[in-house]
Amino acid sequence: MPNTNVFTGMDGSITIAVDDAESPEGQAATAVSDGFGLAPIGRATDVSVSVTSAMRPFHEIGQRYATELRPGNVNVEGTMGRAHINGALLRLMLGDAAAGTRPAGAFVSPTFNLSLLLENPAKPGQRSTLTVHGVKIDGWSYQMPEDDFVLESVSFKGLWIGVEDASGDAG
């Protein structure tokens, strides 16, 4: 049954998981997740995920309006901010290349799934989970303002996205 609840960010949690722990990309993500205790990802803020589909209109000669819309490539991307407490997000982007020494050559970029779980504590079992699969972080920034929290932010891309609703007990 589809979820009909509304949520706030207070109802959310963010976790990462690895689909293929045997691949070099999965091993790199597992090492960062285990080493930095990223289950769940704490102190996150301003999370956004967007999905776009390239839509191509077909125009016939003699017609001003499109006759048909043809779907094209689908892109999944997003951003996330976090109060900076360690180098976990930078390591999720660069893997061992962020370990403090310059890598000698090419290096593996970690790949992981990012799950956003929303569950209202007043209605246990009723939740929505959005999972972005095959995530790679493609941008990282660090802000150190004079009189505010030090924040880091990342942008990411994913291969595909899925959503799952759980209705819990009806009564």
Regions found by a protein language model. Give the residues of each.
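Beta-strand elements of well-folded, non-transmembrane domains
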Residues: V18, V51-M55, R82-N86, L116-A122, ...
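Structured soluble/peripheral alpha/beta segments that form catalytic or ligand/cofactor-binding pockets
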Residues: D46, T52-R64
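Mixed-charge, glycine-accented linear interaction segment located at domain edges/termini
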Residues: P2-V6, P124-G171
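Short, acidic/charged, Gly/Pro-enriched secondary-structure junctions
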Residues: G95-L130
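Oligomerization/assembly interface segments of phage tail-like spikes and tubes
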Residues: Y65-L90, E146-G162
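A generic structural signal for short beta-strands and their flanking turns/coil linkers
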Residues: R43-T45, V74-G78, R102, V108-L114, ...
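Polar/acidic, low-complexity leader/linker segments enriched in S/T/G and N/D
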Residues: M1-V51, I161-G171
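Short secondary-structure capping micro-motifs at structural edges
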Residues: H59-R70, M93-A104, S141
